[in-house]
């Protein structure tokens, strides 16, 4: 499923299926006339470029890390080799449960390993408590939050764009619907197709997690350090959080990610909630990338019970190792899809600002921050958009702080 793409709001996803053309760096090494193997004192063969040699060394290092985590999984199991491999297969089966042919067909591979790729992250409002509740009996759980992430292993950079769940989208034969209805209409595969067309980019991977899974993952990491922007009092989200730098456990992290009514006085609560979700995800990424093999193994084990993804254990460890070195302070860009709220027949909808959306996605696809400025709400301390420019983000004292990038 190789593909190329054109970025644009509401653009149809049309992908070239031709075989990839090798990069120039894949060509044979070029030596000057008269040079002999002995005259080139390099640790790599004259038939291999230095870039390829370096890439191979990094690949070997990554394989060692993957092996270390797999060994850690064996230690966790404390069983024979056969039992350990069966255990890893069980984890893979848990991770891929519900990943059918339709879903894999909706995903589009990158041309080369290591290329930047898009991943759709979905948080559903399901939990064991809700499943057993009469209030939610028979309901299809909705994608309560969606983040379109661009991940670039080569430049160690991640861009997260939150998608407003109430965005009104034309879903063809299904009519005009809120974005979060896509999951209840056609599951993850349909949601991927809708978001891909809406954003004008191919989506290569996806992950879906519910409330319980999120809490378990954070707890498996031993909690995550987060600078909570403001005091949270939101019973609907689960309770109270103090403001300030602190280590959040799974329950506390979920409160921050769900808190919406705590921001009623500031305007669109969903926008602030999405910003906090990106804040927590950045903290999770920082913790995972600095984890030892045992902790990473425990996290994958915990995740596998609640997360659904096209990745397997090896994929997850390989991606984590390739992203080691990511500076989570400056290497993570973030923003939210630009929309305008409108009340229609008693229901609130978000209408995308198409020109701004197209410009944002063009910047994202070029590896640039989605916005040209940081946006920080000084009243709540919430970072609504980040360009990775931490130094400039505090240079303005207006109600919304900005820093041009």
Regions found by a protein language model. Give the residues of each.
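Extracytoplasmic
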Residues: 114-117, 141-146, 155-158, 163, ...
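Entry/capping segment at the start of metal-dependent catalytic domains
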Residues: 50-155
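Second-shell loop/turn segments in exported
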Residues: 132-137, 177-185, 200-205, 243, ...
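Amphipathic, coiled-coil-like alpha-helical scaffolding segments used for oligomerization/assembly
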Residues: 180-242
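N-terminal targeting leaders characterized by basic, low-complexity, disordered sequences
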Residues: 1-51
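Extracytoplasmic/secreted envelope proteins and their assembly/folding machinery
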Residues: 143-145, 176, 188-196, 211-215, ...
């Amino acid at each position: 499923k190789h593909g190329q793409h054109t970025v644009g709001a509401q653009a149809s996803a049309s992908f070239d299926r031709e075989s990839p053309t090798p990069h120039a760096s894949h060509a044979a090494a070029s030596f000057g006339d008269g040079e002999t193997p002995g005259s080139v004192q390099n640790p790599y063969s004259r038939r291999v470029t230095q870039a390829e040699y370096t890439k191979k060394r990094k690949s070997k290092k990554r394989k060692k890390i993957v092996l270390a985590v797999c060994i850690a999984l064996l230690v966790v199991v404390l069983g024979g080799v056969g039992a350990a491999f069966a255990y890893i297969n069980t984890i893979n089966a848990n991770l891929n449960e519900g990943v059918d042919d339709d879903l894999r067909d909706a995903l589009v591979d990158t041309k080369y390993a290591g290329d930047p790729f898009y991943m759709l992250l979905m948080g559903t409002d399901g939990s064991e408590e809700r499943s057993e509740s009469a209030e939610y009996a028979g309901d299809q759980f909705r994608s309560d939050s969606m983040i379109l992430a661009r991940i670039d292993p080569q430049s160690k950079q991640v861009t997260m764009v939150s998608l407003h769940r109430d965005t009104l989208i034309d879903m063809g034969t299904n009519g005009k619907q809120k974005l979060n209805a896509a999951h209840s209409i056609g599951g993850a595969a349909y949601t991927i197709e809708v978001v891909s067309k809406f954003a004008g980019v191919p989506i290569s991977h996806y992950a879906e997690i519910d409330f319980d899974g999120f809490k378990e993952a954070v707890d498996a990491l031993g909690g995550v350090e987060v600078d909570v922007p403001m005091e949270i009092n939101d019973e609907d989200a689960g309770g109270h959080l103090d403001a300030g730098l602190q280590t959040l456990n799974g329950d506390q992290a979920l409160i921050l990610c769900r808190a919406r009514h705590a921001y009623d006085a500031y305007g669109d609560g969903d926008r602030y909630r999405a910003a906090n979700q990106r804040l927590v995800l950045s903290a999770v990424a920082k913790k995972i990338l600095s984890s030892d093999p045992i902790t990473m193994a425990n996290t994958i084990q915990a995740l596998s019970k609640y997360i659904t993804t096209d990745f397997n254990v090896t994929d997850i460890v390989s991606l984590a190792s390739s992203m080691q070195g990511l500076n989570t302070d400056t290497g993570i860009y973030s923003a939210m899809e630009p929309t305008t709220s409108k009340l229609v027949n008693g229901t609130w909808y978000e209408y995308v600002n198409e020109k701004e959306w197209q410009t944002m996605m063009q910047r994202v696809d070029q590896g640039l921050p989605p916005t040209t400025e940081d946006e920080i709400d000084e009243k709540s301390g919430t970072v609504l958009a980040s360009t990775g420019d931490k130094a400039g983000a505090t240079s303005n004292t207006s109600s919304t702080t900005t820093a041009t990038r």
